[in-house]
Amino acid sequence: MAYWLMKSEPDVYGIDHLQREGSTLWDGIRNYQARNFMRSMQIGDRAFFYHSNTKPPGIVGLMEVVETEIVDPSQFDPNSKYFDPAASLQKPRWDCCRLRYLRHFPQLLSLDALRENFSPEQLG
């Protein structure tokens, strides 16, 4: 089992949203490195839910990968901010995965705390 770090802005889609829904399609990713990481994910892998663009940013909970190799439908929707005119049904460019809520952490693990307690090599 691998562990991943996945981020979202809490006012856009936070861990409370995921808890209410139970699971979600983690779509709209338009970064090639992140897309390639998602392509490496396996069912049963765990992901830390990181709240970004908030004060303070940090890890707030844990999710599980429950489905992989999903073609991201938002790339085909011209009304979506994630629309990609270069993508086609025959040659999709973006993938996503489905994640299931596992739990909130009792307290936020802040970015500052991560930096203070772990070296980049340890976080690897």
Give the residues covered by each predicted segment.
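Compositionally biased, charged N-terminal/linker segments
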Residues: 1-43
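Structured loops at beta-to-helix junctions and adjacent beta-edge loops in soluble globular domains
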Residues: 7-9, 50, 102
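Surface-exposed, flexible loop/turn segments at secondary-structure boundaries
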Residues: 11, 55, 71
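Short glycine/proline-enriched turns and hinge-like loops at secondary-structure junctions
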Residues: 17, 42, 57-60, 76
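A general structural signal for short secondary-structure junctions and capping/turn motifs
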Residues: 39-40, 55, 88-91
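Short, charged beta-turn/beta-strand-edge "cap" motif at the junction between a beta-strand
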Residues: 50-57
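Aromatic- and Lys/Arg-enriched surface recognition patch
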Residues: 61-124
